[in-house]
Curated annotation (Swiss-Prot):
This is Recombination-associated protein RdgC. The keyword Cell inner membrane does not apply. GO terms for biological process: DNA recombination; regulation of DNA recombination. Keywords: Cytoplasm, DNA recombination.
Length: 306
């Protein structure tokens, strides 16, 4: 269990996450299949294992792991539009009258309801790790919408979840721009070979660089003409690499072989043991990595009144 992306949320109050109570709460909203006329469903699933006996909360040391699954029927807009046009054309030709918006909308709804039972179904899972002692919830997603779906559903079942996206005192873009300009990152961080540069003016240009020497004159010229770094590939110690963006989203997390080998050794031969060992080692690594990342970005910002 290695996260590939990271959206970081700060608990603004102490929340007593009791694993047994959380298990009971999540069980009130389990994931389920879409009924024939349902567009989507959302609920909690076991992060590890399958079957009714698999726990909805995985506990390892002081960390909790939960997962939610979305099931949705995929109905392409083009299919609906084509069917609607065909129906409207048929009515207008046969009845020699114009089909106006209200009737068109009603026809569209009827077409959707007729097509839904035959639509393809897509399933997607989102994982979140809760670190109560650190006051953090870490969501394995790069889309804030996907993370908010999980957090809002968690809030729904436990009654209250005082949480906000974690922010830092210095703009990540300003810090990353400085690192590339000075060709030196913060301690334990190393600039790699990929970045995105954007012009600060509205409708300004975007430059995306991959497998490129970011110390080159070409990159420096872009920075000197006013562009700023909005995405940057980085490494931390010899343990992980990632891409950081200007919204404080950590993407394309990759844990180095040394960590993965250690988890494999710790986990034994059973699949569940391997998953537990990798999750534990990942969370312990985050316990070192995240405070250093926050410090490198000027320190965590604590909004007034919190």
């Amino acid at each position: 269990m290695w996260f590939k992306n990271l959206l970081i949320y700060r608990l603004t109050q102490d929340v007593p996450f009791d694993a047994e109570a959380l298990e009971t709460a999540l069980a009130t909203k389990p994931a389920r299949a879409c009924a024939s006329q349902e567009v989507a469903t959302y609920g909690f699933v076991a992060p590890f294992g399958k079957g009714e006996d698999a726990p909805l909360v995985h506990i390892s040391q002081d960390f909790l792991l939960i997962a939610a699954r979305k099931e949705e029927r995929i109905l392409p807009g083009s299919v609906v539009r084509d069917a609607l046009k065909e129906k409207v054309d048929e009515i207008e030709a046969e009845q020699m009258r114009k089909v106006y918006k209200k009737e068109r909308d009603q026809l569209k709804d009827e077409i959707i309801q007729a097509f839904l039972p035959r639509a393809f179904i897509r399933r997607s899972a989102t994982f979140a790790a809760i670190a109560p002692r650190q006051g953090l919830i870490l969501v394995n997603a790069s889309s804030p919408k996907r993370a908010e779906d999980l957090l809002s559903t968690l809030r729904e079942v436990i009654g209250s979840l005082p949480v906000r996206p974690l922010t830092v005192k210095v703009s990540p873009s300003a810090t990353m721009t400085d690192w590339v300009k000075t060709q030196k990152a913060a301690d334990n961080f190393f600039v790699l070979d990929e970045c995105e540069l954007r012009d600060t003016h509205e409708d300004g240009g975007i430059v995306r660089c991959k497998r490129q020497d970011l110390t080159s004159d070409e990159i420096q010229l872009h920075l000197n003409t006013g562009k700023v770094v909005t995405q940057l590939s980085l490494a931390w110690q010899d343990k992980l690499s990632f891409v950081l963006d200007d919204k404080m989203v950590v993407k394309r997390l990759k844990f180095e072989d040394l960590l993965q080998d250690q988890a494999e050794q710790d986990g034994g031969e059973e699949a569940l043991g391997q998953l537990d060992a990798s999750f534990t080692l990942m969370m312990l690594t985050f316990g070192e990595f995240l405070p250093e990342l926050f410090e490198a970005l000027g320190g965590e910002e604590i909004p007034q009144g919190i």
